[in-house]
Amino acid sequence: GSVKVVKPAKPARAAAAAAGLNDQVALRALVIGTDANDFGVATWKTTLDRVGASYDVLYDATTPLTTGTLVRPDGVGRYNAILLTNSMQVYESNGSYLSGLDPAEWNILWAYERNFGVRQAALYTSYGTWPENYCLTSNGETGVGSTPINLSLTATGAGVFDYLKSTAQIPLVQSYVYRTSITPGCGAEATITNGSDVLGVRTTSTDGRERLALTFTSNQYLTHSDLLVYGMVRWASKGMFLGEQRHHLNVDIDDWFNTSDHYYPDGHVEYTPGFQVTGHDTVNLDSRQTALRAAHPQAADFKLNIAFNGADIDPFAGNACSPNGGIAELTATTKCLKDKFRWVNHTLNHPELNNTSYATSYQEINDNRAAGNAIGLTSPDSVLKTPEYSGLGVYNPNPNDDTSPPVDHGLTGSNPELLRAAKDLNVKYLHGNMSFASHVPANLNAAKVHPMEPSISVVPDWPTNVAYFVTTPQEETAFYNSFYGPNGRFPYWPTNLTYEQIIDYEAGVALGHVSSGAIYSHTFHIGNVRDYGAGKTLLTDWIDAVMTKYEAFYSVPLLNQDWPTLAAYTSTRTAHFAQLGAGVDPVYDRSTGNITVTSPAAGTVQISGAQGTGASTYGTDVTTTLALAANTAVTVTAVPHL
């Protein structure tokens, strides 16, 4: 369907042999790009995959677009959202600029959108009127490098992107920008601006089709894409799609009651006596957690998860808090504040479990439960965090080598005796590590069913670059620069960073996780909760920075879950993606206001824009998780974003 770009004076709007009027469309997006090198394809796909949406990709440089592309034989529309990588579908070939769609194909697409009431979103557009008029007049063009320009939402844009703060300043970097203005008398409203220039538009065509477009390039690695592309998908689909996007911040602290190695600013590591949490640190951590909730009301439900090793619990301790207490007061103060935190089984003695026997593995899990229960720490039996994620196939073949990077042998390299003991103790979920490829699920927020024991799933955590054995800003800064500074083991930065720069950068990495919708927890260690002065800790410095960045952009809550809830959600997502693979088929009927869902396989699926039993609301988004029987229709009420 490729045709050389020749801009006519007026858009082609000839009547096309297109689909007839129909009220039914599948909840599925069509991404239209020129070819596999089209940057917009990966950008759209990243967001759709994060959400768990159903979609197809059409490469129009080589694949014709026909009525059959868009409409099923029974007259149901195949797609409820059209997602263009760029509004002209232009690409370069042998020195010429071509459009992947010829005039007849454009007209087929427009007729489909018109007849089925389907919206179109373009990830990138310019000024001009070809192939159709987006009501944009040129104010110039510019490239943006690493120094950001700030994007603002108009009142219209704040409605489209209502999960963002209306006052948000969105940093645009590494982009090519068409600066435009709205053509007078044309049916369009600005959604995004930079100064007096329009960089985003919502417009209605002369034949009544609704369109949304940005005038700057994006890719899936940039913050502005994280913030805006979901809103474009949601707008184009009228909020009705498979999957959902919500934002979470979950944090684990490992090794409670245990002793940690201690890294000093001069680079030496103290192993004995090392570092231990005190009663004071515990009281302070509770105070800092309370202060974080007060300072960040969108995270008002935030609560820390603490993974504990019970071998050093003092069984004779009282239960009084000791605000000035030392190591000896840790157990009593923990008992005093036990309900202020959530608790996770991390084994009794913190052994590596790569080669432990069934008996040892069983005792480590079971005895730690007993030790915790004895002082009132309730940890879910279904969840186990093994020491250093051991026992799950990632280990150094030389057990005496503690410094070389471990080797990922895959989950089939797991310790079978650990798995057998865990199963017998009703463990359903084992923490994994996102740094280990074999622990990473195929889909975001899913779990990974263990290939050696299908009753157990692996749910990975995010590691952080706040090192496990640092307790102060000076220690963290020295260690970080010894790794990533210009003279470090893995040089990345041209100069050494300050502590403030490290926290800012690492909080930005975490914001990327949060913006993606990832529910997975971030892991820290006991050294990171030391009160290093004025009540401050490395952990809460990081959390405060992440929450501050989040609240600068988002209006919706920052969610926090206990581990049973988090783990169960990953199983729901695993089932959801299994339904996508099986061919689940939700169809929206605008005449009845219902969505009817069928699947060839039994299972569970998430649907946004649907009000059914157990529906939940997040901002203005409504999601229902549906249980499906094979080949049995289920109908729910649609809640479209109009």
Predicted feature locations:
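An acidic, glycine-rich "communication" segment
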Residues: 8, 12-16, 118-195
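Helical hinge/lid and interdomain linker segments adjacent to catalytic or ligand-binding clefts
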Residues: 30-122, 128-130
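A glycine-centered loop/beta-turn motif at secondary-structure junctions
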Residues: 46-50, 78-79, 116-119, 157-159, ...
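An acidic-aromatic substrate-binding cleft motif
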Residues: 216-310, 339-349
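Catalytic grooves of carbohydrate-active enzymes
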Residues: 217-219, 233-262, 373-375, 463-560
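Carbohydrate-binding surface patches
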Residues: 583-617
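C-terminal beta-strand-rich structural cap/linker in extracellular carbohydrate-active enzymes
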Residues: 620-642
